[in-house]
Amino acid sequence: MALAQLDIFEKMRGLYTPVMGIRRKVLVAVARLIREGRPPQAIEHIPYDIITHNTPTYRDCIFKERAVARERVRLALGQDLREFGAHEPIIDHPEPSLTTHRVVEKPYVAVIKIACERCARKSYVVSDQCMGCVARPCLNVCSKNAVKVTQGRSKIDRDKCVNCGRCAQVCPYNAILYRERPCESACGVDAIVADAEGFAEINNDTCVSCGLCVVSCPFGAIGEKSEMAQVLHAIRSGLPVWAELAPSFVGQFGPLATPQKILAAVRALGFAGTAEVAYGADIAILEEGEKVLEVFRERQADPAASRTFVGTSCCPSWVRAARHAFPDLATCIQDSSTPMVETAKRIKAQV
């Protein structure tokens, strides 16, 4: 029996891939630089510390692999990406990134264009599994005459094809494949388009920073900014920085890392204390309950009140996506602080 088809963002979710490995190596290198107190100029050496060999592993050449790593270092420092093709230092003035204050600004998610392979967009293509059968159902069902037979095999005319998928649906050998750009297909708000040269581009007016494109790109061409550098610099500067732990931390590092060991490691990193995000989740639930009661009171006072329900989520991306998709219901969709934010409020009030 054939396995169930997975959505595009489900295909790599939960898998440890080289893309994830490279991302972690960059973050580790940046963290080590800050904790060891190395000079800011050492940032330029990070791509060479990560990629020590002289032959490419995943891309056309070693220079391209290091160029991608350079852009990932910028993201790890909370900086915007360089324009494609700009030959400049990773950070012109590193000091603003090595600070205890927030430096991250929108956009939070960006395309590393030198890593983008300009994947084919949504289209159908005949594979070498075509048997050149006599029935030729693919040709018969195409209302646009986009399927032709060349040298005994079916071929799709891209200029005529409208991507309806009927040919793939009726092929007895499943020889017609559906191709899609993973990042574009994973985006639920249609924020990813192709620029004039075919590279992926994010429409920041539409993007909700959910990160589905980040986990769906097999080439690691989309990344997110990090505030790790500023947090570590704050710890190194002696500021009281607390770590918030979600309930899932129990299984984050495998069965050998007990909660006691993880808490000890957090303290060893220099955090002043720890707090459970679950507390913030309880507070968020209580606040959402109050918002539901507000709607009930409004309806009791005026049965014709505009708000008929309350849409709530502690995910900011969900709230932005819902308001974008249903602008006429925007008043019914409430802002809810994430459990992380509610926990942070408690920490700041007590410390």
Where is each model-derived feature located?
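Ferredoxin-type iron-sulfur electron-transfer modules and their immediate structural context
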Residues: A2-V170, N174-A186
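A short alpha-helix capping/helix-coil boundary motif
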Residues: K106-P107, C116-C119, V162, I192-V193, ...
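Glycine- and small hydrophobic-enriched segments that form the cores of compact globular domains
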Residues: A120-G211, V215, S226-E227, S237-G238, ...
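Switch II (G3) loop of P-loop NTPases
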Residues: P218
